[in-house]
Amino acid sequence: MKFLICALFLAASYVAASAEAEVKVEEGVLVATVDNFKQLIADNEFVLVEFYAPWCGHCKALAPEYAKAAQQLAEKESPIKLAKVDATVEGELAEQYAVRGYPTLKFFRSGSPVEYSGGRQAADIIAWVTKKTGPPAKDLTSVADAEQFLKDNEIAIIGFFKDLESEEAKTFTKVANALDSFVFGVSSNADVIAKYEAKDNGVVLFKPFDDKKSVFEGELNEENLKKFAQVQSLPLIVDFNHESASKIFGGSIKSHLLFFVSREGGHIEKYVDPLKEIAKKYRDDILFVTISSDEEDHTRIFEFFGMNKEEVPTIRLIKLEEDMAKYKPESDDLSAETIEAFLKKFLDGKLKQHLLSQELPEDWDKNPVKVLVSSNFESVALDKSKSVLVEFYAPWCGHCKQLAPIYDQLAEKYKDNEDIVIAKMDSTANELESIKISSFPTIKYFRKEDNKVIDFNLDRTLDDFVKFLDANGEVADSEPVEETEEEEEAPKKDEL
């Protein structure tokens, strides 16, 4: 009898343990936990895992696209599974896989994880995981294969080669292997080539917008083909959002014409849509991007350009490869002719950078901490008769706010020193051509006599500031201050 009771107890325990390790499914996505994670990975050769936090805005934006991708893969009977881990609950897993931010996505292939580097729309996710689990380019041996391939993928690139061993075909395969975010197909079938009216050694990008397809022209080499994929896979005029940001800033076109508009105000139809022909004409050199003033998330972008949302519709041009150089048209006219003239001047190198600047306050030198703006920066900071310590700050920066009372004390201490000036400049509203600020606060010391610029990298304490100034900036073994808050970074390219 005792044996029977023990056996029943063990059986019940086994069932309970199995139930705990069960994998729930939410909208096609497997719910991974500490209890079932190891088995889930072992049972599936390919698993994309999202580590998320319920409060994370980016995670919330990703959720419907992630579920859509999971469902579409399941419909295709794909062996690829999508899973998610609530990292705020499953802390052990988050620590094991070095999760430092949300969402973090890792792709497990036969148990080995690699970082996910694709986009955040369903089509991008499917393209990326498909590429990771198969050949660089899918072999399309019939018209039916090609039609199904294009049906399964919103954006797809097909190479048409009579000889798959040709140098052109090998170049195509190399590019297909290098670009994880794109889906490639290849065909040597005569019926397929005829169906799509392709030339031998031709490459066509199929897409659901604009002209529906783009035909590659020019010398077929790796550089040209990569640029073709990145440029032609985007709409002629791209709307900036969380999903498109990585494609906009990760592409090969580094000069962007930005349209600040209100969709609710009808600006797209009135001002943007008529510019598609111009966008097509300049698409190899300039990317056209719309930024909506209706989105709260875009407030920081407006601040970065020294604008407010009441100024829409308006345009700016930014050149990412040269320290985020910005350009502003002289006219408020948004006609196609005026905008094209503006672009021509830019491409001909005839435009001068637009630098933000505030008006100089009348009482800028009233207090111990002197106030600098673009117009008085050189006359104060580069005055060779004095050494000048300048804090470049942002009004919203938490570290800057913490520094303020210490910086005031420092200025009070040196207010009667004829050789040292303590100053500050709001770098969100004032820009300098010679100095680019990428994080806040940035503190620089402009030494008297030779104007040598020395970065202050000690702890931001009164004692360390005094030590630094008394040593005329020559302090050995300065250690950079480690910033811990994300808000202290100046706007990054992928935030614009």
From Swiss-Prot:
Its EC number is 5.3.4.1. Disulfide bonds join 56-59, 397-400. One of its GO terms (biological process) is response to endoplasmic reticulum stress. CDD domains: PDI_a_family, PDI_a_PDI_a'_C, PDI_b'_family, PDI_b_family. InterPro entries: PDI_thioredoxin-like_dom, Prot_disulphide_isomerase, Thioredoxin-like_sf, Thioredoxin_CS, Thioredoxin_domain. One of its GO terms (cellular component) is fusome. Gene3D superfamilies: Glutaredoxin. It catalyses: Catalyzes the rearrangement of -S-S- bonds in proteins. A motif (Prevents secretion from ER) lies at residues 493-496. The record marks 460 as: Lowers pKa of C-terminal Cys of second active site. Keywords: Disulfide bond, Endoplasmic reticulum, Isomerase, Redox-active center, Repeat, Signal. The record marks 120 as: Lowers pKa of C-terminal Cys of first active site. Expressed in all head and body tissues. GO terms for molecular function: protein disulfide isomerase activity. Homodimer. Participates in the folding of proteins containing disulfide bonds. This is Protein disulfide-isomerase. It comes from Drosophila melanogaster (Fruit fly).
